[in-house]
């Protein structure tokens, strides 16, 4: 019995030694395989350069998350990695102009102006026509200045620069601003003013106004006994303007009134002295 127990203890010790040796050999084999193949650092760098969905999980169960979400390869505070910039192929247009700082393809500034430092993206037929017209105008100006040095430059500039007639202004929902011809409107206004002046200066209108004035001023009994000849002579002779209308009695606040006409309110010192004092009964 004692001999069997001793053999069992030796077998267990040997088994433990074998397990320990196997566990010690596994990391060495992993290091050898990693040294023969690509290292994990290069794999991690490659993963950082690409867009991947999840985090990187290492064999030691450590989780490494991507520090930069965007593929711009930027470090903190706006700095870029100098090692990664060499592998990037920059997209360029028309020479050495970089595409990245240009936001819009039209290269336009505010208020329709273009950046003079950058060339135009596309050349149209309108640009060619404009350039040709400018060259022709400059040649004509040089010829005119060479032949007639004392000529009037104002007439030349008036002929060269003419205002372009714009299209009629359009409003929203298909409406348009009504455009009237200026000549017709001016002629109508002139004719209307001439007609008004002729009416004011005519004898018929003046007689009608004088008749209205006399109708409201002369009492009815006097107007009934007046002869037709007298009225005609009065109309011909009376060229005075309308008299100022007599104002109504002065009104005070809160509905009160003086009860007197404006002519009766103020009396001169002579009138006040001539008025006898009231006697008390």
Curated annotation (Swiss-Prot):
Keyword terms: Amidation, Cleavage on pair of basic residues, Neuropeptide, Secreted, Signal
Modification type Phenylalanine amide: residues: 77, 111
GO molecular function: neuropeptide hormone activity; neuropeptide receptor binding; receptor ligand activity
Reported tissue expression: Stage 17 embryos show expression in the two brain hemispheres (neural cells located in the dorsal posterior region), the connected ventral ganglion (pairs of neural cells along the ventral midline) and the peripheral nervous system (expressed in the antennal-maxillary sensory cells). In the brain hemispheres of the feeding third instar larva, expression in neural cells is located in the dorsal-anterior region of the protocerebrum.
GO cellular component: axon; extracellular region; extracellular space; neuronal cell body
Propeptide: 31-64, 115-165, 176-246, 257-281
Spans annotated as Disordered: 137-156, 226-281
Chief location of this protein within or outside the cell: secreted
Keyword Transmembrane helix: no
Signal peptide start-end: 1-30
Location of this chain's protein in the cell: Secreted
Modification Tryptophan amide, positions: 173, 254
Keyword Signal appears in the UniProt entry: yes
Biased composition (Polar residues): 271-281
Biological process, per Gene Ontology: adult feeding behavior; circadian rhythm; determination of adult lifespan; larval feeding behavior; multicellular organism growth; neuropeptide signaling pathway; positive regulation of cell size; positive regulation of ERK1 and ERK2 cascade
Function according to Swiss-Prot or TrEMBL: Plays a role in controlling food intake and regulating body size.
Additional comment: Flies overexpressing sNPF are heavier and bigger than wild-type. But loss-of-function flies are not smaller than wild-type.
Family as reported in the entry's similarity comment: Belongs to the NPY family.
Name recorded for this polypeptide: Short neuropeptide F
UniProt lineage: Eukaryota, Metazoa, Ecdysozoa, Arthropoda, Hexapoda
The encoding gene: sNPF
């Amino acid at each position: 019995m004692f001999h069997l127990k001793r053999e069992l203890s030796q077998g267990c010790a040997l088994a433990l030694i074998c397990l320990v040796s196997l566990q010690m050999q596994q990391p060495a084999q992993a290091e050898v395989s990693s040294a023969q193949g690509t290292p994990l650092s290069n794999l991690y760098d490659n993963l950082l350069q690409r867009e991947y969905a999840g985090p990187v999980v290492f064999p030691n169960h450590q989780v490494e998350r991507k520090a930069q979400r965007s593929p711009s390869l930027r470090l903190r505070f706006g700095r870029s990695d100098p090692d990664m910039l060499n592998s990037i192929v920059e997209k360029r247009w028309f020479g050495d102009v970089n595409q990245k700082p240009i936001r819009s393809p039209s290269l336009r500034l505010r208020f329709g102006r273009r950046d003079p430092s950058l060339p135009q993206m596309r050349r149209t037929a309108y640009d060619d026509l404009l350039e040709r017209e400018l060259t022709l105008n400059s040649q004509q100006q040089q010829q005119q200045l060479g032949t007639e040095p004392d000529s009037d430059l104002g007439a030349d500039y008036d002929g060269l620069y003419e205002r372009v007639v714009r299209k009629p202004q359009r409003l929203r929902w298909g409406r348009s601003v009504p455009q009237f011809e200026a000549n017709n409107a001016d002629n109508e206004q002139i004719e209307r003013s001439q007609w008004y002046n002729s009416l004011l200066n005519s004898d018929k209108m003046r007689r009608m106004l004088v008749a209205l004035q006399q109708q409201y001023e002369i009492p009815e009994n006097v107007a009934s006994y007046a002869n037709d000849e007298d009225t005609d002579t009065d109309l011909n002779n009376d060229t005075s303007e309308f008299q100022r209308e007599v104002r109504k009695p002065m009104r005070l606040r809160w509905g009160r009134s003086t009860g007197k006409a404006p002519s009766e309110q103020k009396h001169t010192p002579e009138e006040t002295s001539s008025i006898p004092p009231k006697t008390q009964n």
